[in-house]
Amino acid sequence: MDKKTIYFICTGNSCRSQMAEGWGREILGEEWNVYSAGIETHGVNPKAIEAMKEVDIDISNHTSDLIDNKILRQSDLVVTLCSDADENCPVIPPNVKKEHWGFDDPAGKSWSEFQRVRDEIGQKIKQFYDN
């Protein structure tokens, strides 16, 4: 069976989409190719790396990447994680399903905010996997 492809997109591919990619590889990795990208690149937020390390998921080697049209076209599912990405995402081919899972941006906020958003993203991906 061929793996499906899921593509997590947010504004800067810095926090939310990085955490989603980490959770996605952990939870969906057997059945899905998991990628993340941004409309812009802001670098991977060190607090996102630290937050994921706290749940034993290593995203320290992730890079902050712009949306890759080849991956976009080959995706089975594109998930936008913020309203900016939802509104400004490139045109998605008709064969690709798109969903919006909105999460607060923890950048510049308290450590507990990173933990909360990390846990919310993880919970959503677990629910997605279970369905």
Curated annotation (Swiss-Prot):
Pfam family of the protein (one): LMWPc
Coiled coil ranges: none
Disulfide topology: 10-82, 82-89
Reaction(s) this enzyme catalyzes, per UniProt: arsenate + [thioredoxin]-dithiol + H(+) = arsenite + [thioredoxin]-disulfide + H2O
GO biological process: response to arsenic-containing substance
Molecular function in Gene Ontology: arsenate reductase (thioredoxin) activity; protein tyrosine phosphatase activity
CDD domains for the chain: LMWP_ArsC
Main localisation: cytoplasm
Keywords: Arsenical resistance, Cytoplasm, Disulfide bond, Oxidoreductase, Plasmid, Redox-active center
Example of a GO cellular component annotation carried by this entry: cytoplasm
Catalytic residues of the enzyme: 10, 82, 89
Subcellular location: Cytoplasm
SUPFAM superfamilies in alphabetical order: Phosphotyrosine protein phosphatases I (SSF52788)
Oxidoreductase found in the keyword field: yes
KW Cytoplasm (keyword) present: yes
EC number: 1.20.4.4
Enzyme's top EC category: oxidoreductase
Domain of life of the organism encoding this protein: Bacteria
Function according to Swiss-Prot or TrEMBL: Catalyzes the reduction of arsenate [As(V)] to arsenite [As(III)].
Family note: Belongs to the low molecular weight phosphotyrosine protein phosphatase family. Thioredoxin-coupled ArsC subfamily.
Protein name, as recorded: Arsenate reductase 2
Species assigned in the record: Staphylococcus saprophyticus subsp. saprophyticus (strain ATCC 15305 / DSM 20229 / NCIMB 8711 / NCTC 7292 / S-41)
